[in-house]
Design a protein with these regions (language model features):
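Outer-membrane beta-barrel transmembrane domain signature
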Residues: 46, 56-61, 90-95, 117-250
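Mid-chain, structured segments of secreted extracytoplasmic proteins
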Residues: 71-107
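Outer-membrane beta-barrel proteins and related beta-barrel translocases across Gram-negative bacteria
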Residues: 33-38, 92, 103, 208-210
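Short glycine/proline- and aromatic-enriched beta-strand/turn motifs that initiate or cap beta-hairpins
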Residues: 25-74
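Generic structural motif
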Residues: 36-40, 98, 221
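Cleavable N-terminal export/targeting peptides
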Residues: 1-32, 250
Length: 250
């Protein structure tokens, strides 16, 4: 009788263990679907600006996406430690991945032109990223509109709005080496001055030049360089174009 009860107890424990293990495995499989990418970026205007992106598949051709950029790690430290976070939806169409997102900034660049303390909800950033990869050719288009979400200006101060976009295309000449070209523009798209009037629009920079990318497995780096097409006397950037990125995919 004792042995029967013991066997039943062991059987129940075994079933419980198998059930818990199965649930744990299922949860781990779900968690494994989450993809993360880390980009350690450094350029002539923003300085160091690391970014993280995340995606979780909803269907075979769609993903829920998230992103964050620490602009304040570089020159944007003076803009209320400017920070950006957003989310969106990625759609795959052949060799294209189309990812509209909506971001928000924290800091003081957009809400007061860097004059007042940093705030949550400094700006809103509707943006679009389109990636192309057919195993041989690669490309990316990005466009974002940085608009002041809150107005924290005092008399004579202005909110600021920006348009930031780039396009790069390249070709893999070997499995680990890609060569291509990059164009990027940052434009001040105006703003409202407290007390009346608007801030004039102006190009901060227009970068153009080649890039070289080396990669293997989950990581790699890209170096882009060239010239700034804007007039140094009217732009906010007087440097040549150079940008270095280290990227890792998990």
């Amino acid at each position: 009788m004792f042995m029967i009860k013991l066997n039943k107890t062991l059987f129940v424990l075994l079933i419980s263990f198998v059930s818990i293990f199965s649930v744990t495995q299922a949860q781990e499989k779900k968690e494994d679907k989450l993809s993360l990418s880390l980009s350690l970026n450094h350029d002539a205007f923003f300085g160091f600006n690391p970014a993280v992106t995340a995606s979780y598949p909803v269907t075979k051709k769609t993903d829920l996406t998230f992103y964050g950029i620490q602009w304040g790690a570089g020159t944007a430290r003076a803009w209320g430690n400017w920070t950006e976070f957003g989310l969106g939806f990625n759609m795959k169409a052949g060799d294209f991945a189309i990812n509209p997102q909506l971001g928000f900034t924290m800091g003081n660049l957009l809400s007061s032109g860097t004059n007042q303390p940093g705030i949550v909800g400094d700006g809103i950033v509707p943006n679009l990223t389109i990636n192309y990869d057919d195993k041989k050719n690669i490309g990316q288009f990005y466009a974002g509109y940085y608009a002041a979400l809150r107005n924290k200006t005092e008399a004579g101060e202005s909110t600021l709005n920006y348009v930031h976009y780039w396009l790069n295309v390249g070709r893999r000449v070997t499995p680990w080496l890609a060569l291509g070209a990059h164009y990027e523009n940052l434009n001040l798209a105006g703003g409202k001055i407290k007390g009346g009037g608007n801030t004039n629009s102006a190009d901060y920079y227009k970068w153009i030049g080649p890039f070289i990318q080396v990669s293997k497995g989950i990581g790699g780096m890209r170096f882009s360089f060239g010239t700034d097409l804007t007039d140094d006397e009217t732009s906010n950037s007087n440097s040549d174009f150079y940008k270095l990125s280290f990227f890792f995919n998990f």
